[in-house]
Regions:
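Adenine-nucleotide phosphate-binding core of ATP-dependent small-molecule kinases
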Residues: 66-95
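Glycine-rich phosphate-binding loop plus the immediately following alpha-helix
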Residues: 11-49, 150-154
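Glycine-rich phosphate-binding loops at beta-strand->alpha-helix junctions
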Residues: 88, 101-129, 140-144
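Active-site nucleophile and cofactor-binding loops and adjacent substrate-binding regions
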Residues: 1, 16-24, 84-87, 111-116, ...
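Internal, active-site/partner-interface "lid" segment
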Residues: 39-67
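Conserved small/polar residues in nucleotide/adenosyl-binding loops
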Residues: 2-7, 162-167
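Glycine-rich phosphate-binding/hydrolytic loop that grips phosphoryl groups
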Residues: 26-31, 138-164
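Solvent-exposed alpha-helices and their adjacent loops that cap or buttress functional pockets
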Residues: 6, 10, 61, 74, ...
Length: 169
């Protein structure tokens, strides 16, 4: 699942959790790259030099395979398909999953997270669509788990405090 947290003046302005799946995007790109005998890194690099990124729509990656096969039949280059996949993953996440109307609504200060953002083509596609430079932390792929661990620790500590207070009574 995906979550979008909007910050305004150092406070959370809104939180949106998707109602649809957006998982498996990175896995799909990696599997497709391997099917063409590319590493995911080389596949992403190819996308960065695409002349005509293939329009693969904004469908879930589960249903995108047929669009990719059609693009291959029509003679699209590996670079154009790779770029098209990166754009499609971002468009799906922003417009179908998070359901924003305009990418500029994201603002100019964006931090991305998730393992799929380790893919430079996906990151660059996001930046082009959003019209801003995004910050990709070194721990982008584990930020969700890290955040969950922090929440769990806070909950655990509050339970210990509550238990300690109850024992003192």
């Amino acid at each position: 699942s995906e979550m979008c947290i909007r910050d305004r003046n150092h406070t959370v302005d809104s939180v949106q959790l998707n109602e649809a799946c957006s998982s498996g995007c990175g896995s799909f790109i990696e599997t497709f790259a391997k099917s063409l005998n590319y590493t995911v890194v080389d596949f992403a690099k190819a996308a960065l030099f695409a002349k005509n990124p293939t329009d693969l729509g904004t469908r879930c990656t589960v249903f995108m395979n047929s669009n990719v096969k059609q693009a291959q039949k029509e003679g699209a280059t590996v670079a154009d398909i790779s770029a098209g996949l990166a754009y499609s993953v971002i468009k799906n996440a922003l417009f179908k999953v998070i359901k924003i109307n305009d990418a500029s609504d994201l603002g100019k200060h964006v931090v991305v997270q998730g393992g799929t953002f380790y893919n430079d083509a996906v990151l660059r596609s996001f930046e082009k669509i959003a019209g801003c430079e995004a910050v990709r932390p070194d721990i982008a792929g584990i930020m969700g788990a890290f955040g969950a661990a922090l929440v769990a620790r806070e909950y655990y500590q509050s339970c210990l405090l509550y238990t300690s207070d109850a024992a003192d009574d």
